[in-house]
Each structure stands twice: as structure tokens, then as C-alpha cells.
Amino acid sequence: MAGCGEIDHSLNMLPTNKKASETCSNTAPSLTVPECAICLQTCVHPVSLPCKHVFCYLCVKGASWLGKRCALCRQEIPEDFLDKPTLLSPEELKAASRGNGEYVWYYEGRNGWWQYDERTSRELEDAFSKGKKNTEMLIAGFLYVADLENMVQYRRNEHGRRRKIKRDIIDIPKKGVAGLRLDCDSNTVNLARESSADGADSGSAHTGASVQLPVPSSTRPLTSVDGQLTSPVTPSPDAGASLEDSFAHLQLSGDSIAERSHRGEGEEDHESPSSGRVPDTSTEETESDASSDIEDAPVVVAQHSLTQQRLLVSSANQTVAERSDRPVAGGGTMSVNVRSRRPDGQCTVTEV
């Protein structure tokens, strides 16, 4: 019995040891870095898309410029994914920012410097240590040339856009690593991205200050009353004058128009061109449209309208006088108050 128990005990221990070894073998592959299906290398700063496929962050960024879809399942990539990516290991980003050596490589961005990812930084350091003048880098599906003499980088097929690079110590202030910001609490969102896949700033940041464009104020030409220039934009001290004063000004200006109409052409006594115009009274309610006609019509037309209206007033007064001479049924005379309208818009009351 004891022997059987010992045998049974040894037999029970074998599967346990075997299971432990299997567990160790299963946990080892989980620590390996996944491979990227775009660059066909181990992922650098791996990110997980909503479809659960894993790629390098810069590879996803480069693919998003072309189709904004997953490279494997073609599911659409959200618009804000590049601004708020889902990192598999955020601690790796912080470790990469601290670096392994004394010097690392940076490229220029807006208002700061970005650190290259670890793989690209090793390639640049290797070329620099060997004394090469330039080297090529594959970043997000685009070939870049790093000019180590002039310390600039540019796309191999686009030499116009150049970006400064530098080799510096690890502890200098920087914005992030390979387009991934170190300050995760930043609320800055890139609204319009350019076609840049090297992890640089590719959009204009949204600022809280709003720029207001100056609105041009509508200006009106200067007008004159009795030869004095007045500005309709600036209120005059006599803005509160009564309608009678305004009508008096209109009458004076109307008479001056009539006087000038009798002069020949070129006989203006060096008067200013604007002295013959009447102030714009569109804001005041007049009882007739004759004043507005005088304001805009030429001198000849104004003279003709003045003469015609004077004839109408005189004929109306004559008709009223004839009617007043007729006897009334009561034996008295008829007293009529006639309200006439002068050409300048002023109303007068004539008692007959």
C-alpha cells in the first residue's frame, strides 16, 4: 500500500511539473515584441487599432495618409487615432525618452524638437560614427535622406522640404518621441494635417485666442450747408435743432443753387465742388420728395423744378383768392386758410 502510495505520488508529480514547464514556455512568447505587417520588422512603439491589429505607430501614421484604413482588414481608422493612439506599452515610450546612451538624435518640429525612435536613432548614430556624409532612413513607408554634413533631412523624392536634425544629449527639453507626445494631458488637437509621416507637427494647433478682423466702417462723403463742410458720420453740435431750422438751411441752399444756375459755365468763383450740395436729410422725415430731388439732380433740373413748383403755388393762391371773393349764404365773406408747400419742402400757411 505504501509503495503504491509512493508510486501514485510520483505519478501525480509528473503532470504537475509538466504543466509548470508548459506554463513557462507559454509565457515566454508573450513577452516578445509583435511584428509589424507594414514594415515587416519588430514594432517600434506598437499601437492597437480598434480592429485589434497591431502596427508601429509611424507605420499607421504613414498608412493613414494613403487610405485611412487598416492594412490587414481594411477597417476605417478613426480621425483622432493619431492624436490619441492606444499604446500597448506606454512605459516603453517613457523609457525610450530617457534613452540608453548619452547622445540621441532629434529632428525639428514646431516650437521644439522631437526625438527619433530608437531604431532610427541607432541607424543615424552608426552612420555618424563611420563618418558617412549621408544615410537613408525608412520612416513610415517613406525614404528619407539624412544629410550629416548640413544636418538636415528630406524625402528622397522631394528635396524642397527640409528639416533640421541634431545630435544632442538625452536630457534636453523635447516634445516627444517619433510624434508621440510625452505630455499625455495635452488637449491640443491637430485640425488639418499635412502629408508628413515622419512624426513631425503636421497641423496647426487650435488656440484659444480668436483673431477678430477689423470691420471697415462705411464712410460717407462730406456735405456742405451754406458753404460749411459737415461730416454725416460725426454728429454736429446742432444735431438737436428743430425741423424749422433744417428747412431754413434747405431754403438757403436751394436759393444758392438757383443763383448759380444763372451763371455761365466756368464762372464759378473758385468754390469747392462740394459747396453746391445739400446735406443728406434721409434720416429726417420730410413732407415731400422735392427736397430729395433737389439734392441729387443737376443744377439745371433743380432750377426747372423750382420754377414749376412756384407756378403751381401761385396758381393755387389765385384760385383760392377767387373762391374767397364769392359771397357766402350767410352774407359774409369766406376766410380760407391755405397751406401751401414751398419748393424747398417748407410748409407755409397763407390766410386769405
Swiss-Prot record:
SMART domains: RING (SM00184), WWE (SM00678). PANTHER family: E3 UBIQUITIN-PROTEIN LIGASE RNF146. Residues 282-293 have a biased composition (Acidic residues). It comes from Rattus norvegicus. It comes from the Eukaryota. A glycoprotein binds at residues 107, 110, 114, 144, 153, 163, 175. It catalyses: S-ubiquitinyl-[E2 ubiquitin-conjugating enzyme]-L-cysteine + [acceptor protein]-L-lysine = [E2 ubiquitin-conjugating enzyme]-L-cysteine + N(6)-ubiquitinyl-[acceptor protein]-L-lysine. Residues 91-167 form the WWE domain. This is E3 ubiquitin-protein ligase RNF146. The WWE domain mediates non-covalent poly(ADP-ribose)-binding. Pfam families: WWE, zf-C3HC4_3. Keywords: Cytoplasm, Isopeptide bond, Metal-binding, Nucleus, Phosphoprotein, Transferase, Ubl conjugation, Ubl conjugation pathway, Wnt signaling pathway, Zinc, Zinc-finger. Pathway: Protein modification; protein ubiquitination. Residues 197-210 have a biased composition (Low complexity). Ubiquitinated; autoubiquitinated. Autoubiquitination is enhanced upon poly(ADP-ribose)-binding. Its EC number is 2.3.2.27. The keyword Cytoplasm applies. Residues 215-233 have a biased composition (Polar residues). A zinc finger (RING-type) spans 36-74. GO terms for biological process: cellular response to glucose stimulus; cellular response to hydrogen peroxide; cellular response to hypoxia; negative regulation of cellular response to oxidative stress; positive regulation of canonical Wnt signaling pathway; protein autoubiquitination; protein K48-linked ubiquitination; ubiquitin-dependent protein catabolic process. One of its GO terms (molecular function) is poly-ADP-D-ribose binding. CDD domains: RING-HC_RNF146. It is found in: Cytoplasm, Cytosol; Nucleus. Can form homooligomers. Interacts with PARsylated AXIN1, AXIN2, BLZF1, CASC3, H1-2, IPO7, LIG3, NCL, PARP1, XRCC1, XRCC5 and XRCC6. Interacts with DDB1, DHX15, IQGAP1, LRPPRC, PARP2, PRKDC, RUVBL2, TNKS1 and TNKS2. Binding often leads to interactor ubiquitination, in the presence of the appropriate E1 and E2 enzymes, and proteasomal degradation. There is a cross-link at residues 84, 94, 130, 175 (Glycyl lysine isopeptide (Lys-Gly) (interchain with G-Cter in ubiquitin)).
